[in-house]
A protein has these predicted regions:
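Non-catalytic interaction/regulatory segments
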Residues: 1, 40, 50-142, 148-163, ...
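N-terminal catalytic cores of NTP/NDP-binding nucleotidyl/phosphoryl-transfer enzymes
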Residues: 2-31, 35-38, 125-127, 203-215
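Conserved short loop/turn motifs at secondary-structure junctions
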Residues: 9, 45-54, 84-88, 205-213
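Short, conserved phosphate-binding/catalytic loop or strand-edge motifs used
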Residues: 39-45
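Core alpha-helical transmembrane segments of integral membrane proteins
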Residues: 179-185, 198, 214-220
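Mixed-charge, low-complexity segments
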Residues: 192-201
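Conserved small/polar residues in nucleotide/adenosyl-binding loops
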Residues: 221-227
């Protein structure tokens, strides 16, 4: 599986695509606010505060549609440096960005502009949004701001981006194959175990078939352990 963070080419491209996604979200939800949007091993993500709006499959489809529009428009991406005071003024309506800026040392801060969207970022980025056209948003989840359960929940949207459509399709095929091998899917499809949110998702409960399978190595251990101890 591709490591997007380690591959410099994919790292830059996916970092840029995260900004395209943020711009699309801002078009659809003008009141949206943004925390961080890094590249990780699996691609990229952005943590977003959508207020009372929740992310679902329809929202993801709408964001992807707007992203395709932005990519097709081929917006030039520019890097510029501003002072910390200018950054605080520029992002004065986004408390998440203000929190990030407050944590930076005094001096110039880099931002990236693409069309009507500006974001705080170290970079680097590609020079045009059209280079981000081969993307896919792959999953979403709720996360606590800064990973602190005492904070409110933000929406984290994950995606991947490749230089070519062929590379994207090949990667999506690998993800689909991995999903088919996932023990959670296999367990559900074969009726081996179930999970209950009231008990805890990390505490699966065996169903009859699963219990039978689990008993096999347990029984074998009971039969062979005395022999092993005598050796």
């Amino acid at each position: 599986m591709v490591d997007f963070k380690a591959d410099e080419r994919l790292n830059t491209l996916n970092h840029s695509c995260a900004h395209v996604m943020a711009q699309a979200v801002k078009h659809l939800y003008p009141e949206a606010k943004f925390w961080v949007g890094p590249v990780v091993k699996e691609g990229f993500y952005y943590d977003i505060d959508l207020g009372e709006n929740a992310v679902n499959d329809d929202v993801i489809a709408a964001i992807e549609k707007e992203m395709k529009k932005i990519c097709k428009e081929g917006k030039k991406i520019y890097r510029r440096e501003i002072s910390k005071a200018e950054a605080l003024e520029l992002f004065k309506d986004d408390e998440y960005k203000l929190d990030l800026i407050d944590g930076l040392e005094d001096g110039n801060i880099s931002v990236y502009d693409q069309g009507d969207f500006t974001d705080l970022c170290r970079g680097p980025h590609v020079d045009n949004t059209k280079l981000c056209k081969n993307f896919k948003l792959i999953k979403y989840s709720g996360v606590y701001w800064k990973g602190d359960a005492n904070n409110h929940v933000m929406q984290r949207i994950y995606g991947v981006c490749f230089p070519t459509a062929e590379e994207l399709e090949a990667h999506l095929q690998l993800l689909e194959e991995a999903k088919e091998r996932d023990h959670r899917k296999i367990g559900k499809d074969m009726g081996l175990f179930m999970v209950d949110d009231l008990i805890g998702r990390g505490l699966p409960m065996f169903l009859p078939k699963g219990y039978t399978i689990w008993q096999e190595p347990v029984s074998y251990t009971h039969l062979t352990l005395p022999t092993i101890l005598l050796v």
